[in-house]
């Protein structure tokens, strides 16, 4: 358990999806792409770029403006870093980098530094300046920014690139925060990214996910 979890487990759970579990998936997927060489870069980097872009958009348009109203200036460094990361990702995605492998390593260094800064500065500020219910309310607005097509791509990716413990935490949050009539759809998308045994393990620990029967 981290220090932030010990201080306020309820608030930590509310911010962790966007500032812990997505971050871990981004790190792991980028590491995988780097280790996989040119072929994997060509096939999988476009998806990584789309998901990272949307993640940054959600911060820039949803979470950061709300936080700036209560803690002016706290997200300034993250805003600047978003621009640096976006520029390098765009150059990689459009073939403008002369040395793809070297540029990917630069991206990893920049991205890791950026994510750590958010986890050490922005995430604690969210917990300091918002009640858990307010954070959940912001989280509940994510679908305003995400198309069903994006969510269908993102959810399998997310659950594939976090470990079993993180899957349980994210799934528990979804089981509570997602409308009951939409939960079966999300479950189908999540299951698409997992092996049958992994899905069985997850539904055993989060029974609410047993509503649908993935094929």
Give the location of each predicted region.
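Small-residue-biased structural context
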Residues: 1-215
